[in-house]
Amino acid sequence: MNSESVDSDVAASTSNKGNELCSSSTDITSLSVSSPNESVIHSSHSASEADEYVCKLSYEGNRKKRIYNGSAEAGKEKKLQKQRAQEERIRQKEAERLKREKERQQREQEKKLREQEKIAAKKMKELEKLEKERIRLQEQQRRKEERDQKLREKEEAQRLRQEQILNKERQQLKLNNFFTKGVEKRIAPNENFVADKTDELNEFEKEFRPFFIKHQMSLSKYPSPNESDSFLDEVLSTSKSYPLKLNDIFTPSDAVSSANSLGVSNRNSENEVRQLMSAYQDPSVSKPQEILSCLSQIPIKFIFFYQDVRPPYFGSYTKTHSHGSNVLLNPWLEDEDIDYTYDSEAEWVADEEDDGEDLESEDEEVDNSDDIVEDGDNAFVDDEDDDKDSVNASNTHRSSGPLEVIVEGPVWDSKFLPDFNCLSLIEPISSFSASTYLQIDPKEDLWASQDTAPASSGMTIGPTSSLSDDLQVRFPSEDIPKFIEYVRNSHDNKVFLIENLRHMFPYVTKNIISETLGKVAVRKGKSVSDGWIIKENFASLLSS
């Protein structure tokens, strides 16, 4: 309820009471007269005075009522203001409380965010640490792999060098059949040093040469229970008068166990290998890889002696000894199926002569006069005689060992070849003929007289050539600059250089290449880095 409604109600009640007082003036007069304490009022008052008095009282009452009503309204207004102020304070306190709550929540949220950031930073540091550790381990592993790779490459290079050395030795041994050894300059050994070295060697080292385990080899150990040093010392220091035998040291059980460890069995391994080889060569076999795996399990022997000139034997040996396992107890037992008097070393021994290298081969021991164009009726007659002499001389350099005869043919292809008769030539061109590679001049008159030879031959340099007499060689004049240029840039020895020149000039024979090489160039030295020097007479022919 507001103040205006209260004021209207108070005024209405006051006017009503005033009216009631005015209407009951008689009652008031009577009351005033009848009152024992009233001494002022007299009965003589008139009615008008009474009415005036009553109105005055009514007015005074109304004024007091109005004053009372105003004070009540002011109290109510103060009370309302106080209530509103209290409500305002409550609202402010609630707003402050909400503000503080909001700030507290915000601070808690910020604190949580800071904690999350700290946790994330800690996790990030841990991840970075793990990543650094992983990179360090990876780098360490990479360096280790690089070291291992370098070590493997070094071992592989060393193995390849050893194989190259062995292959070179084998090739050199094979080349000894075709080339004679030159005079080797041997330095006189120091006698004092040899004597001192001989004194240092004991009887065992003098009897048995040093042995080295090579690639793809393994040293088998004899499984004897009595091979300790103490037992051998006791046997060697014994004072018995009779000589010791192998049976006194090694028992038969040791021999049997040794035979089993070496892969010796009672089965006929020779026949087994032959069956495997025949099965592998059979085209109807569906799985040849299984046969190869069986062949790879056969033990391989490497037989080589330091005094041998021939290459060592490297392969399978499955023949059984005629004496069986007794050969394990007595290695000097001779097999009845082997001819020990035959010396195959003679096939590899070459005669030592001082004639130098012989570059002839069997397929070139023919007359090479057809490979050149004659410069007259009597051209190169002396050279042909020289070729015959060189062929006869090369025959003396051949090995004196027995030759194996191989007979092949005739082979008739009656099922396949008839279908292509219409496509074949009457006389096919031979790929081994030197005339196939000769260049044919399309402008040359082949039906002209043979007496009118061309001014400059393709295979010789005659008197009409631009070269002088001391520069005449039996080599195509147009290829001499190319020949000299290749020789000058080469570091190969004479044998390999001639072979390379043969591949470069297939239409020129080996004799002419060797002769031309000896005339135009000379080797600087014998080392690999040394090359060839072109003689001054042919230096002007180098291509610019």
UniProtKB/Swiss-Prot annotation:
Signal peptide: none
One MF term in the entry's GO annotations: H3-H4 histone complex chaperone activity
A Gene Ontology BP annotation from the UniProt entry: mitotic recombination-dependent replication fork processing
Renumbered residue ranges of the record's region Interaction with histones H3/H4: 325-396
Keywords: Chaperone, Chromatin regulator, Coiled coil, DNA damage, DNA repair, DNA replication, Nucleus
Location of region: Disordered: 1-52, 67-117, 138-160, 351-400
Intracellular or extracellular location(s): Nucleus
Protein name: Chromatin assembly factor 1 subunit A
Organism: Schizosaccharomyces pombe (strain 972 / ATCC 24843) (Fission yeast)
Underlying gene: pcf1
